[in-house]
Amino acid sequence: LEMENREIDGAEKMVPIVFLVIIGTIVVYGFLAGPIARRLGLAEAHVDGVLIAGSNAVARGLAGSLKSHGVKSLLVDTDPYSVTRAIAAGLPARRMSVLAEEAARDLDLRGIGRLLACTSNDEVNALATARFVRVFGRREVFQLAPTKLSAGGASVPEEYLGRVIGIQPITYAALDERTRSGWRVASVSGGSTVSNAAADGEFMPMVRVVDGKMAFLCRNDPIPSDGHVIGLAAPPFLERLS
């Protein structure tokens, strides 16, 4: 990646090869991670909670909104400040790399059935989904859209990505830009209020919650008309909700 940033000839061809090696290693360990975690009672099948890689403002907001609907979450981040803020807000959080070999073994994944990779690093997000696909299954590993993929110059091979959240793919850069402009995570009743705000560019739907069951919204999903929709809301929309 450093070679690519310095525009060294052939660097762009090496990135997929590097990812093949790294992900191949992760998959080998991953084949054991799921069965071991379930045997130890650390992970369960068919549960609704979410492991969130990243403890930034949006990740904490999502975890807080999910908690208000009775959905369990666990935040994991290497940044002590972000983890401390999560704990201070009453959210379960661990200071740990989601890519650590011991992560699937040491994290208490009881009640957790899916992953959201929500860090600022595209490569970490892709590698996290590769590691946890054997714990949760291919359909239950989600991530933000890689910035370079959205721009048409992916450094992460698309076949290694988890399921990208957002009816329109959401990048970390988009989330960061909006939170710096006062956007905040909000939970809104499904229906015309949400659909109108989304159409006006004032709301980014991310999660649907119905009767305590959550589902990430992905490409081309319809905006829910029932339950609650959790997403990032612009200041004018937040004012109308208050």
What is the role of each PLM region?
Residues E2-S242:
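Cytosolic regulatory regions of ion transport systems
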